[in-house]
Amino acid sequence: MKDLLNLLKNQGQIEEFDAIRIGLASPEMIRSWSFGEVKKPETINYRTFKPERDGLFCAKIFGPVKDYECLCGKYKRLKHRGVICEKCGVEVALAKVRRERMAHIELASPVAHIWFLKSLPSRIGLLMDMTLRDIERVLYFESYVVIDPGMTTLEKGQLLNDEQYFEALEEFGDDFDARMGAEAVRELLHAIDLDHEIGRLREEIPQTNSETKIKKLSKRLKLMEAFKDSGNLPEWMVLTVLPVLPPDLRPLVPLDGGRFATSDLNDLYRRVINRNNRLKRLLDLSAPDIIVRNEKRMLQEAVDALLDNGRRGRAITGSNKRPLKSLADMIKGKQGRFRQNLLGKRVDYSGRSVITVGPTLRLHQCGLPKKMALELFKPFIFGKLEMRGLATTIKAAKKMVERELPEVWDVLAEVIREHPVLLNRAPTLHRLGIQAFEPVLIEGKAIQLHPLVCAAYNADFDGDQMAVHVPLTLEAQLEARALMMSTNNILSPANGEPIIVPSQDVVLGLYYMTREAVNAKGEGRVFADLQEVDRVFRAGEASLHARVKVRINETVKEKDGSITKNTRIVDTTVGRALLFQIVPAGLSYDVVNQPMKKKAISKLINQCYRTVGLKDTVIFADQLMYTGFAYSTISGVSIGVNDFVIPEEKARIIDAATEEVKEIESQYASGLVTQGEKYNKVIDLWSKANDEVSKAMMANLSKEPVVDREGKTVEQESFNSMYMMADSGARGSAAQIRQLAGMRGLMAKPDGSIIETPITANFREGLSVLQYFISTHGARKGLADTALKTANSGYLTRRLVDVAQDLVVTEIDCGTEQGLLMTPHIEGGDVVEPLGERVLGRVIAKDVFKPGTEDVIVPAGTLIDEKWVEFIELNSVDEVVVRSPITCETRYGICAKCYGRDLARGHQVNIGEAVGVIAAQSIGEPGTQLTMRTFHIGGAASRTSAADSVQVKNGGAIRLHNLKHVERVDGNLVAVSRSGELAVADEFGRERERYKLPYGAVISVKEGDKVDAGAIVAKWDPHTHPIVTEMKGIVTFVGMEEGITIKRQTDELTGLTNIEVLDPKDRPAAGKDIRPAIKMVDANGKELLLPGTDVPAQYFLPANALVGVADGAQIAVGDVIARIPQETSKTRDITGGLPRVADLFEARRPKEASILAEISGTISFGKETKGKRRLVITPTDGSDPYEELIPKWRHLNVFEGEQVNRGEVISDGPSDPHDILRLLGVSALAKYIVNEIQDVYRLQGVKINDKHIETILRQMLRKVEVTESGDSSFIKGDQMELTQVLGENERLAEEDKFVAKYTRVLLGITKASLSTESFISAASFQETTRVLTEAAVTGKRDYLRGLKENVVVGRLIPAGTGLAYHSERKRKRDADKPVRVSASEVEAALTEALNSSGN
């Protein structure tokens, strides 16, 4: 019988739907939803607690309070289902209908919907072409509006105040109609003829010239068309009927003590009903106009507060002075319907507890307390007990479990066997924050966690808690085992490197056992095999660190997969031989024949995974951990104050530095250097001193003298505990040791500038009070940052996930030939990331040729794996075009070829992989490790001293790239361009290093010269910016008058005079507009022209420039005629860390961005205007010159007559990504953003694969701006989805019409998320009101393509295993669609069939 009841309960059929449409509800629609009208503001009877009839909780309208029982109790039980009681009018039904039945209120006067009025831009205002202010004056009964002017001089839509209205009445009588309030607005909206207006606007737009007017008109046109297409009527934005929410969604809950807790909505509804009823009465009584007007205004305000409290005027507050929660507040924000209930729900079958270490567990296990397991698996246990016949009913089983009988434990063990559970640690920043384990029952109350997965969870055991979830269905268990098991997640999805890597104790143990010592016990012995080593070590006859020879048998898996076995004798140590016992067959002995530092261990696991596969790697990782723990225990490494050895040289270095600082101070006192230069020099000095101290300290710590077997004293690597911990990578770093045993160094103020006086003491010596005080500055800032950082990082991740959530791999190959050009990433001359690392796991887009030949060595379409990388590097290829998510041409989603390798699995990515979310998590997860600014060593400032020369690291041939230069008399070259670079190539022509050469650098080598390592090939002054002449001649000064535009300074020490150009602000009135310049003339005083142009050679001097030549002096090519001092350098990169990443992803235009050349051509300067210079670029092809006004204070990098290319920097500053996209194109933008973001992460030592950043970039480049509409329906200036425009263009091209032209637009991630096609996704992200208003007006359809939308409607997501479900549904849908064929097609098919049969 019970099952029968359940059957009846589950009768609600789930409707199949493919899209969700949102629109405006017409009054008829609202009435059709309703089950009756709410006429009274009463809720429930305070004595009987029964709902009042016709009130807000009326049972007649909304349904019975108890299941199958009418209100008066006449009809009870199931047999009367569907009967309507004649006494109380209640239908006998389930009580849950009170959650779905709506009611309505008939408003006595129309009311404008506040969302369409106040949500910017105001839709009502835009449609009626009136300002918001004017409409509000009409709505809130301050002015009349003319609805029908009749034959009078008034105009439709004109506002009249009371006086004007009465004057008009006297003048025109009843010839015109003017009203006030929402009914007037409704009449006006009703009167709009959409088709007529659209036609008028389409004609008007091409005839207007002003940009702003066109913008306004096209906005109106868009809105009108939206109304027309969606079938919404404009007058529906004014409500005449108000729907009432079902009562169970705004409940009245009895508290103990006879009081009631109520939802705020009830108060808001009561207010509306009260005012509405009062208004009805007043209208029946035909009360005076002014009273009715006031009541109507109050009704409008009451409805406003119900829909969106606080949107207009002061929010209505409840009894406790806090604003009431309106309908809009219910859906928006973190606590709103979307984020609280639809996207994140609490789940059954879960528990949480503190975690502790489980060093004895295997990698796929976790320890689950028996108490928790019993509770979590209860239903399974009940079922098993009943099945076994140990309990007759569920009730009996329950009793058994409560008593914890012995049988129960046996059953529990059986239930748990092979039933994985999910462990999750909040915050879940990436997908490895939830993994599956097989539970092992343990005593105690804490969950035991395997130490190797701590890195993935970012867990430690200082009181962290974790949650356990039980996958119930077979499918869930299958997915947990196959996809989420910790053993299947060895590689990190962010960079493809192992994440199951030993750390801390384990590393220390492995490092300790693989170190070698001089003259240790047993040195020089030879062993027959590993077993013998083991026996001798256990017998205590040989030390762990003794150097010995061992015969080993190794099985090596070659690159091509073949297996070779060989036996050889190796020089090694006892510990390494012992470690080799656990290394899986297939790896050579060389992998352990080195001190196992953290990097080496990580590399070993990686190599193991690539060579012998997953299963062996997992076993090996476990063995490594057990071994590491064992030997770190044996080592007994500890830390004591005597481990911090302070170098003797420290005092000398510090004294020397102090002396030099005094010297600089005295120079400053006598005015030889400026404040800024002094600051720079002092800080450079101390940075150098600090480095020297730490060098001396590390040299001191890392070596120790020992006596070898011959009795000689030799140096060996130190066994100092602190040094071993840092060297192995177990804990601590050189920087931290420096603070313990060297000197703490320079500290930063909270604003990021560096304090000039360093802390010369270290922690062992102890700090003085002043030093401690300076330290607290940086340290406190560090703590404040950490708190901010977590929130900011979480928000960044949320925005990233939101912008990329619907990016899923949907096909294998999109067939594009586009790609990005990859080159090695070079910074400061070093190759930071070689080409091999950048192309690993990507697909080649264009054939790769052997350098200098036509031979294809890598064909297009190859997925580059480790073997290919070696091959590419062998052939010294230095650039490769690879496919990229940015250039992928798949319409919805992305193709596997453009994405390349799935980093966490090591093969080509599967269809259905949610690459967008993975990218977002990979970028967001390390966010908390990024600083809020750039430095981070207990507040100690890290600042490199400014580079002033290029010293090559490798010998080889010099190559000069893109370098414009002049040759000086002494044969040296002087750079006169900014983008010049110098590279060094080895004998194979491979580029080993590359350096940027600044303007004015003196280069002592020529193209093709051979240099040795360590040679200094270029020099420049880092603190000033020179102006270099490109010709020889005689200097003449123009506009340089002493005391007016320049001042002379004489150097007391050298007696030389310098001329300094005054800032226009400091000049007397006479000199404000004079532009001091240096002109070049020949011996006859005729002015010289710049070579190759007809521009006179003159150099305008900016403010503060120092001129080093005298008037009339003879100068040669390449001489410096003036220097511009550079400003104080703050700590490198003002915005560092997280804010920088956020700025890049939000595509914010930086303040004082660099100015780029809009076209290629010759530079000249036009007439100046107030405070601005006019820069003119004349193109070489003779088209129109381009002019731009640039503020005078901007320092220009170009001189009159210089040639520039489109996109070259004219004035330095941070780059603006929008400019890069506009002038240089998508690939330049991709390169810029990827490199900038990688720089921030690299500084923190975080590795992220480029493709993740490219994936997010793809989403930022989704939109295009239409520049010419052609024959399409787009309007010029529209922002459209790229896919939409491409689709339309294909259609137009087929019909031989003109296609629309467009430019790509870069949107920041927040903006990109909000402009997605899915309104459900956008509304659940941010600005819910705005998104829903816009979607409703345009009658948007959400086709549920993304992940978020499907989560909201409660479906499987279209990614991973859910993709099959969705493709199946799509297949069914397509099969059901009728196919339309034209008559001609049928005819053609018939003739073809006839012909073929005839043959």
From Swiss-Prot:
Specify which residues bind Zn(2+) 1 according to the UniProt entry for this protein. Answer: 70, 72, 85, 88
Which positions are annotated as binding Zn(2+) 2?
A: 814, 888, 895, 898
The signal peptide, as residue positions, is: none
Cofactor(s) for this UniProt protein:
Mg(2+); Zn(2+)
Query: Which reactions fall under this protein's catalytic activity?
Result: RNA(n) + a ribonucleoside 5'-triphosphate = RNA(n+1) + diphosphate
A cellular component term, taken from the record's GO annotations: DNA-directed RNA polymerase complex
The UniProt keyword set, sorted, is: DNA-directed RNA polymerase, Magnesium, Metal-binding, Nucleotidyltransferase, Transcription, Transferase, Zinc
Q: What is its EC number?
A: 2.7.7.6
Q: Which domain of life is it from?
A: Bacteria
Oligomeric state and interaction partners are given as: The RNAP catalytic core consists of 2 alpha, 1 beta, 1 beta' and 1 omega subunit. When a sigma factor is associated with the core the holoenzyme is formed, which can initiate transcription.
**Similarity-based family:** Belongs to the RNA polymerase beta' chain family.
Q: Which NCBIfam families match?
A: rpoC_TIGR
Q: What does this protein do?
A: DNA-dependent RNA polymerase catalyzes the transcription of DNA into RNA using the four ribonucleoside triphosphates as substrates.
Name of the protein this chain belongs to: DNA-directed RNA polymerase subunit beta'
Q: Which gene encodes it?
A: rpoC
